[in-house]
C-alpha cells in the first residue's frame, strides 16, 4: 500500500508541473492581448510604416 501511495504522489507532482506550464502560457496570452491592442493602432498607421518593418518587430518580440 505504501508503494502505491508513493506512485500516486509522483503522478500528482507531474500534474502540478503541467499546471505550472499552463500558468506560464496564461502570461503569454496577456502579452498577446496587449499586442492585439497595438495591432489596432497599427492598422490606423498603415500608411506611415511599411508592413515588413512591423512583421519583423512582431517576430522579435515573440
Swiss-Prot record:
UniProt note on tissues of expression: Testis.
Domain of life: Eukaryota
Subcellular localization(s) per the UniProt record: Nucleus; Chromosome
Main subcellular localisation: nucleus
Record-level Gene Ontology MF annotations: DNA binding
Region called Disordered, residue ranges: 1-62
Entry GO CC: nucleosome; nucleus
This protein's UniProt keywords: Chromosome, Developmental protein, Differentiation, DNA condensation, DNA-binding, Nucleosome core, Nucleus, Spermatogenesis
Record bears the keyword Secreted: no
Entry's Gene Ontology BP terms: chromosome condensation; sperm DNA condensation
Family: Belongs to the protamine P1 family.
Cited function: Protamines substitute for histones in the chromatin of sperm during the haploid phase of spermatogenesis. They compact sperm DNA into a highly condensed, stable and inactive complex.
Protein name, entry field: Sperm protamine P1
Organism field: Dasyurus viverrinus (Eastern quoll)
Gene (name only): PRM1
